[in-house]
Regions:
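Active-/binding-site microenvironments in catalytic and ligand-binding cores
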Residues: 1-193
């Protein structure tokens, strides 16, 4: 677990350390949308497409936005919209998906961002880039970096607004429910421009 705590501190009684209630007041700040689907010229990325650290940098450059320490970075792949439009959810939760490549773990660490969020069910590309590890990106970014993740974000309206005015930064607020000893929570994220 993050900050040197043993994973055995999470059991049927919940998280004895690092519970979600501890970060409730911290989930607000500068948000940045990286619309990688629009940057790549596609409506949505196909399942299994890995978005690299270089892709994130190039997308930010094309949007004329700089990722700064403490930012909440929100990555749009278009997958949520594609599933909504097709009215097809089979395999969405737990199945193959576009997502962040393993090399983005180092990018996250170097940028010192507060959180990473996507419109996919797990942020990380599926199938994974490695055959010998299940969800290797998660095994690095959660316990080693301590990153907070947001998943299954609906980004169509935000992406449209950002594309229209070419402003990809905003005030972002997404406090979790104060569920004592929980390791995650539903949220109602808001981007305020």
């Amino acid at each position: 677990m993050w900050n040197g705590y043993d994973a055995r501190l999470v059991d049927s009684d919940g998280a004895q350390k690092n519970g979600i209630e501890k970060v409730r007041a911290e989930m607000a700040g500068r948000g940045v949308l990286l619309d990688v689907a629009r940057w790549a010229g596609v409506d949505f990325f196909e399942d299994g497409i890995a978005i690299s650290a270089n892709d994130l940098d190039e997308c930010a450059k094309s949007q004329n936005v700089e990722i700064k320490q403490g930012d909440f970075v929100i990555v749009r792949t278009g997958q949520m919209e594609q599933r909504l439009d097709a009215e097809e959810w089979g395999g969405y939760a737990g199945g193959d998906a576009p997502g962040l490549a393993f090399d983005t773990a180092e990018w996250i660490y170097n940028k010192e961002i507060a959180a990473i969020c996507t419109d996919t069910w797990g942020c990380e590309v599926r199938p994974n880039e490695t055959k010998d590890a299940q969800q290797p990106w998660h095994w690095v970014v959660i316990p080693m970096i301590g990153i907070t993740m947001g998943e299954i974000f609906y980004l169509r309206d935000l992406a449209k607004d950002c594309d229209e005015d070419k402003v990809y930064e905003f005030f972002f607020c997404a406090p979790p429910l104060p569920i004592t000893k929980a390791v995650g929570s539903p949220i109602n994220p808001m981007a305020i421009k």
